[in-house]
Amino acid sequence: MIREERLLKVLRAPHVSEKASMAMEKNNTIVLKVATDATKAEIKAAVKKLFEVEVDTVRTLVVKGKVKRHGQRIGRRSDWKKAYVTLKEGQNLDFIGGAE
């Protein structure tokens, strides 16, 4: 069993993009920014506990940070992990909450 403190640290934020909103509409999939050391099992448990929905599958990828310049200085943004969480049929989760 995964401790509750760990579950709260696994999920960082929803990832809002055009592709993410299309995935939510078509495939009942939510896109989340998660901790880089989070496993698929931890992500599934965290979504299930925090949002009280049934999870079907979890797919993850690591987004590599871009090299950016500020004047002459060259820096690099941090790598981060993204998770595509597909909910089971009949489950619904509305992050954006459009006007009704």
UniProtKB/Swiss-Prot annotation:
InterPro entries: Nucleotide-bd_a/b_plait_sf, Ribosomal_uL23-like, Ribosomal_uL23/eL15/eS24_sf, Ribosomal_uL23_CS
Single Gene Ontology MF annotation: rRNA binding
Keywords on record: Ribonucleoprotein, Ribosomal protein, RNA-binding, rRNA-binding
Gene3D superfamilies, A to Z: 3.30.70.330
GO cellular component: ribonucleoprotein complex; ribosome
Pfam families with a match to the protein in the record: Ribosomal_L23 (PF00276)
Any one GO BP annotation for this protein: translation
Family listed: Belongs to the universal ribosomal protein uL23 family.
Complexes and interactors: Part of the 50S ribosomal subunit. Contacts protein L29, and trigger factor when it is bound to the ribosome.
Role noted for this protein: One of the early assembly proteins it binds 23S rRNA. One of the proteins that surrounds the polypeptide exit tunnel on the outside of the ribosome. Forms the main docking site for trigger factor binding to the ribosome.
Database matches in PANTHER family: 60S RIBOSOMAL PROTEIN L23A
Protein name as catalogued: Large ribosomal subunit protein uL23
